[in-house]
Amino acid sequence: MPVFSFAQKKIVADMLKKKCDDLHCPLFIEKRDFAVDVLEKTPSGQRFLYVNHKTGERMELFTPELNIVQTRNIGLVLFILETLFSIPLEKMRKEIKKIYIPGRFEIISKKPLRVFDPCHTPESFKNFLKSFSVIEKPSKSVLCIFLLKDKKIKTIFSMAKDAGFKKIYWIDLPVLRKKDPSSFFCKDLILSSENFSKLWKNYKGSLACVGSFYLAPLITLKRF
């Protein structure tokens, strides 16, 4: 199976090459000659403008995805299919509405609302806030943060407080933490994994979890 990437950093390209060599997959690193601009974001998805700089073609499209990262990934798919496989953009319009890409801003359930986003940097957390505020008010929601690097915890916690979340918890997983979280979180804001599980299952209001790709299978498949 061929692998396509727009990796510009040498360290990323080298890592991909090694992995593809191990799996015997051909790797194609392409120049990013496309742009994606979000025109409108609603609870049902995003209307965006896709521009192929290589062909000059541009088209307004809709995706049920709410995270800008996933919309850019859809732009990558469009560019590859249109440029490398000569599939007309118009033929892909309807199919785009069906594309679901797991891993970013996943709505696990709507009633009660459960959202998971493995954002772990201030920039990605900012994107999470933009998406989340479209479907729910932070003031009505509980936010759970876990597995963030120490230097980023205070920044993201501050951003979460400014966003006005009803309650913000740090989920304490000792096996993966680097230091005692009580050094930067009040003890009553720290939850054990067991108490987090109870909160996730029993809380009737809206709840969002952010912090790490490592726990994606646990959250999205409810394995906790």
Question: Model-derived features: where do they sit?
Answer:
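Short glycine-/acidic-enriched loop or helix-start segments at secondary-structure transitions
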Residues: D14-L16, L39, F125-K126, I153-T155, ...
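Short, acidic/turn-prone active-site loops that include or flank metal/cofactor-
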Residues: R32-F34, H120, I145-K149, W170-R177
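Nucleotide phosphate-binding/pyrophosphate-handling subdomain across enzymes
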Residues: H53, E57-F165
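Alpha-helix capping/helix-boundary segments
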Residues: Y214-L215
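Acidic, Mg2+-coordinating active-site environments of NTP-dependent enzymes
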Residues: M1-E60, I74, L78-E90
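C-terminal helical cap/extension that packs against the catalytic core
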Residues: V3-F28, L113-V115, K154-A208
